Protein backbone atom coordinates (compact mmCIF):
# COMPACT_ATOMS: atom_id res chain seq x y z
CA UNK A 1 0.00 0.00 0.00
CA UNK A 2 0.85 3.67 -0.09
CA UNK A 3 1.61 3.94 3.61
CA UNK A 4 -1.24 6.26 4.61
CA UNK A 5 -4.98 5.85 4.12
CA UNK A 6 -8.03 8.10 4.23
CA UNK A 7 -10.62 5.98 6.02
CA UNK A 8 -13.35 8.56 5.38
CA UNK A 9 -13.41 7.78 1.66
CA UNK A 10 -14.23 4.93 -0.69
CA UNK A 11 -14.54 1.35 0.47
CA UNK A 12 -13.41 2.18 4.01
CA UNK A 13 -16.41 4.47 4.43
CA UNK A 14 -18.82 2.06 2.75
CA UNK A 15 -17.82 -0.92 4.88
CA UNK A 16 -17.35 1.12 8.04
CA UNK A 17 -15.01 -1.52 9.45
CA UNK A 18 -12.66 1.08 10.88
CA UNK A 19 -15.40 2.24 13.25
CA UNK A 20 -15.07 -1.00 15.20
CA UNK A 21 -11.28 -0.75 15.17
CA UNK A 22 -9.22 2.42 15.35
CA UNK A 23 -12.41 4.51 15.34
CA UNK A 24 -13.50 2.96 18.62
CA UNK A 25 -10.06 3.19 20.24
CA UNK A 26 -9.91 6.91 19.49
CA UNK A 27 -13.08 7.40 21.54
CA UNK A 28 -11.51 6.25 24.81
CA UNK A 29 -9.52 8.46 27.18
CA UNK A 30 -5.92 7.33 27.39
CA UNK A 31 -6.38 6.32 31.04
CA UNK A 32 -8.86 3.63 29.95
CA UNK A 33 -6.31 1.94 27.69
CA UNK A 34 -3.51 -0.45 28.50
CA UNK A 35 -0.03 1.09 28.13
CA UNK A 36 0.58 -0.74 24.84
CA UNK A 37 -2.75 0.25 23.30
CA UNK A 38 -2.34 3.84 24.51
CA UNK A 39 1.11 3.91 22.91
CA UNK A 40 -0.39 2.67 19.64
CA UNK A 41 -3.12 5.33 19.66
CA UNK A 42 -0.53 8.04 20.32
CA UNK A 43 1.56 6.65 17.49
CA UNK A 44 -1.38 6.71 15.08
CA UNK A 45 -2.05 10.35 15.95
CA UNK A 46 1.64 11.26 15.66
CA UNK A 47 1.93 9.62 12.24
CA UNK A 48 -1.07 11.60 10.99
CA UNK A 49 0.77 14.80 11.87
CA UNK A 50 -0.38 18.24 13.07
CA UNK A 51 -3.79 19.34 11.88
CA UNK A 52 -4.70 15.95 10.38
CA UNK A 53 -7.15 13.41 11.72
CA UNK A 54 -6.04 9.83 12.39
CA UNK A 55 -9.09 8.79 10.36
CA UNK A 56 -8.21 10.81 7.26
CA UNK A 57 -4.48 10.01 7.54
CA UNK A 58 -4.42 6.54 9.05
CA UNK A 59 -0.91 5.05 8.98
CA UNK A 60 -0.21 1.67 7.46
CA UNK A 61 2.63 -0.59 8.53
CA UNK A 62 5.35 1.20 6.47
CA UNK A 63 4.56 4.54 8.13
CA UNK A 64 4.40 2.99 11.60
CA UNK A 65 7.72 1.17 11.18
CA UNK A 66 9.34 4.32 9.79
CA UNK A 67 8.17 6.21 12.86
CA UNK A 68 9.45 3.58 15.30
CA UNK A 69 12.75 2.61 13.76
CA UNK A 70 16.03 3.89 15.10
CA UNK A 71 18.30 6.10 13.02
CA UNK A 72 20.60 3.12 12.37
CA UNK A 73 17.82 0.71 11.32
CA UNK A 74 17.46 -0.10 7.63
CA UNK A 75 14.01 -0.49 6.10
CA UNK A 76 13.27 -2.06 2.71
CA UNK A 77 9.73 -1.78 1.32
CA UNK A 78 8.43 -3.76 -1.66
CA UNK A 79 5.24 -2.70 -3.45
CA UNK A 80 4.03 -4.19 -6.74
CA UNK A 81 1.73 -1.39 -7.87
CA UNK A 82 3.43 1.65 -9.38
CA UNK A 83 1.02 4.23 -7.94
CA UNK A 84 1.37 2.87 -4.41
CA UNK A 85 5.16 2.62 -4.75
CA UNK A 86 5.25 6.26 -5.83
CA UNK A 87 3.16 7.25 -2.81
CA UNK A 88 5.65 5.45 -0.57
CA UNK A 89 8.55 7.29 -2.20
CA UNK A 90 6.77 10.61 -1.70
CA UNK A 91 6.13 10.01 1.99
CA UNK A 92 9.15 7.97 3.08
CA UNK A 93 11.68 7.99 0.25
CA UNK A 94 13.75 10.88 1.62
CA UNK A 95 14.45 9.17 4.92
CA UNK A 96 17.93 7.76 5.41
CA UNK A 97 18.38 3.98 5.18
CA UNK A 98 14.98 3.52 3.51
CA UNK A 99 14.77 1.65 0.20
CA UNK A 100 11.52 1.43 -1.75
CA UNK A 101 11.28 -1.27 -4.41
CA UNK A 102 8.61 -1.42 -7.08
CA UNK A 103 8.57 -5.20 -7.09
CA UNK A 104 6.73 -8.28 -5.93
CA UNK A 105 7.10 -8.69 -2.18
CA UNK A 106 7.58 -12.44 -2.42
CA UNK A 107 10.46 -11.97 -4.84
CA UNK A 108 11.94 -9.37 -2.49
CA UNK A 109 12.10 -11.96 0.29
CA UNK A 110 14.41 -14.04 -1.87
CA UNK A 111 16.39 -11.10 -3.26
CA UNK A 112 16.92 -9.17 -0.01
CA UNK A 113 17.72 -12.03 2.37
CA UNK A 114 19.94 -12.64 4.14
CA UNK A 115 20.67 -9.04 5.16
CA UNK A 116 23.93 -7.98 6.73
CA UNK A 117 22.15 -7.65 10.09
CA UNK A 118 21.83 -10.71 12.31
CA UNK A 119 18.45 -9.65 13.67
CA UNK A 120 15.45 -7.98 12.12
CA UNK A 121 11.83 -8.28 11.05
CA UNK A 122 10.24 -9.37 7.78
CA UNK A 123 6.59 -8.29 7.60
CA UNK A 124 4.48 -9.96 4.91
CA UNK A 125 1.08 -8.32 4.44
CA UNK A 126 -0.51 -10.04 1.42
CA UNK A 127 -3.69 -8.94 -0.39
CA UNK A 128 -5.31 -12.38 0.01
CA UNK A 129 -7.44 -11.94 -3.08
CA UNK A 130 -7.65 -15.75 -3.35
CA UNK A 131 -6.95 -18.77 -1.15
CA UNK A 132 -3.88 -19.52 -3.31
CA UNK A 133 -2.21 -16.60 -1.51
CA UNK A 134 -1.53 -18.90 1.44
CA UNK A 135 0.58 -21.15 -0.80
CA UNK A 136 2.66 -18.18 -1.94
CA UNK A 137 3.08 -17.03 1.65
CA UNK A 138 4.28 -20.46 2.76
CA UNK A 139 6.76 -20.71 -0.11
CA UNK A 140 8.15 -17.25 0.67
CA UNK A 141 8.36 -18.07 4.37
CA UNK A 142 10.23 -21.31 3.70
CA UNK A 143 12.65 -19.49 1.39
CA UNK A 144 13.14 -16.59 3.78
CA UNK A 145 13.64 -18.77 6.84
CA UNK A 146 16.16 -20.94 5.02
CA UNK A 147 18.15 -17.87 3.99
CA UNK A 148 17.81 -16.07 7.33
CA UNK A 149 16.96 -18.51 10.14
CA UNK A 150 17.57 -15.93 12.90
CA UNK A 151 15.13 -13.37 11.48
CA UNK A 152 11.65 -12.74 12.83
CA UNK A 153 8.92 -13.24 10.23
CA UNK A 154 5.42 -11.84 10.74
CA UNK A 155 2.55 -12.71 8.38
CA UNK A 156 -0.88 -11.10 8.52
CA UNK A 157 -3.87 -13.15 7.38
CA UNK A 158 -7.67 -12.68 7.44
CA UNK A 159 -9.96 -14.79 9.59
CA UNK A 160 -12.72 -16.10 7.34
CA UNK A 161 -15.02 -19.10 7.16
CA UNK A 162 -12.87 -20.73 4.49
CA UNK A 163 -10.65 -23.74 5.11
CA UNK A 164 -7.50 -22.15 3.65
CA UNK A 165 -6.07 -20.90 7.00
CA UNK A 166 -6.38 -24.41 8.49
CA UNK A 167 -4.61 -25.91 5.47
CA UNK A 168 -1.93 -23.23 5.78
CA UNK A 169 -1.40 -24.21 9.41
CA UNK A 170 -1.04 -27.89 8.58
CA UNK A 171 1.40 -27.17 5.78
CA UNK A 172 3.42 -24.82 7.98
CA UNK A 173 3.56 -27.39 10.78
CA UNK A 174 4.88 -29.91 8.25
CA UNK A 175 7.51 -27.52 6.86
CA UNK A 176 10.06 -28.07 9.62
CA UNK A 177 10.09 -24.40 10.65
CA UNK A 178 10.22 -24.09 14.44
CA UNK A 179 9.03 -21.45 16.92
CA UNK A 180 5.78 -20.50 15.17
CA UNK A 181 3.33 -18.40 17.20
CA UNK A 182 -0.22 -17.67 16.03
CA UNK A 183 -2.21 -14.72 17.37
CA UNK A 184 -5.81 -13.90 16.47
CA UNK A 185 -8.45 -11.30 17.28
CA UNK A 186 -12.01 -11.71 16.04
CA UNK A 187 -14.92 -9.27 16.38
CA UNK A 188 -17.57 -11.61 14.97
CA UNK A 189 -18.73 -15.18 15.70
CA UNK A 190 -16.66 -18.02 14.26
CA UNK A 191 -19.59 -19.18 12.10
CA UNK A 192 -19.98 -15.80 10.37
CA UNK A 193 -20.93 -16.94 6.84
CA UNK A 194 -19.32 -14.21 4.73
CA UNK A 195 -16.54 -11.67 4.88
CA UNK A 196 -13.71 -11.20 7.34
CA UNK A 197 -14.44 -11.62 11.04
CA UNK A 198 -11.00 -10.72 12.34
CA UNK A 199 -7.25 -10.86 11.81
CA UNK A 200 -4.45 -13.25 12.54
CA UNK A 201 -0.69 -12.96 12.77
CA UNK A 202 1.72 -15.83 12.33
CA UNK A 203 5.05 -14.95 13.94
CA UNK A 204 8.17 -17.04 13.41
CA UNK A 205 10.96 -16.49 15.95
CA UNK A 206 8.90 -14.06 18.07
CA UNK A 207 10.66 -11.94 20.69
CA UNK A 208 11.03 -13.54 24.09
CA UNK A 209 7.87 -13.41 26.25
CA UNK A 210 5.79 -11.88 23.45
CA UNK A 211 3.30 -14.72 23.77
CA UNK A 212 2.76 -14.05 27.47
CA UNK A 213 2.31 -10.31 27.00
CA UNK A 214 -0.14 -10.76 24.14
CA UNK A 215 -2.13 -13.27 26.17
CA UNK A 216 -2.61 -10.51 28.76
CA UNK A 217 -3.14 -7.66 26.31
CA UNK A 218 -5.48 -9.08 23.67
CA UNK A 219 -8.49 -9.85 25.92
CA UNK A 220 -8.41 -6.26 27.20
CA UNK A 221 -8.21 -4.93 23.64
CA UNK A 222 -11.09 -7.19 22.60
CA UNK A 223 -13.29 -5.86 25.42
CA UNK A 224 -12.70 -2.32 24.19
CA UNK A 225 -13.51 -3.19 20.60
CA UNK A 226 -16.44 -5.54 21.27
CA UNK A 227 -18.29 -4.65 24.48
CA UNK A 228 -20.79 -7.51 24.02
CA UNK A 229 -17.98 -10.07 23.87
CA UNK A 230 -18.66 -11.34 20.35
CA UNK A 231 -15.69 -13.13 18.80
CA UNK A 232 -12.57 -13.57 20.88
CA UNK A 233 -8.79 -13.83 20.94
CA UNK A 234 -6.19 -16.57 20.92
CA UNK A 235 -2.45 -16.92 21.42
CA UNK A 236 -1.23 -20.36 20.42
CA UNK A 237 2.08 -21.97 19.60
CA UNK A 238 1.56 -23.83 16.36
CA UNK A 239 5.11 -25.16 16.54
CA UNK A 240 7.41 -25.04 19.55
CA UNK A 241 11.20 -24.99 19.67
Task: Show where each model-derived region lies.
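Class I S-adenosyl-L-methionine-dependent methyltransferase catalytic core
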Residues: 2-241
Amino acid sequence: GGGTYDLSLGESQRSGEYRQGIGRLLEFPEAALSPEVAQYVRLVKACAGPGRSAITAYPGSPTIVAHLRRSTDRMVLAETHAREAQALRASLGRQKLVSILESDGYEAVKAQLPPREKRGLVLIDPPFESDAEFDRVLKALETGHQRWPTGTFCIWYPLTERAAPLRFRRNLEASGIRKVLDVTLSVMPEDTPVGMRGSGLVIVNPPWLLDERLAELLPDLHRLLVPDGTGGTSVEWWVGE
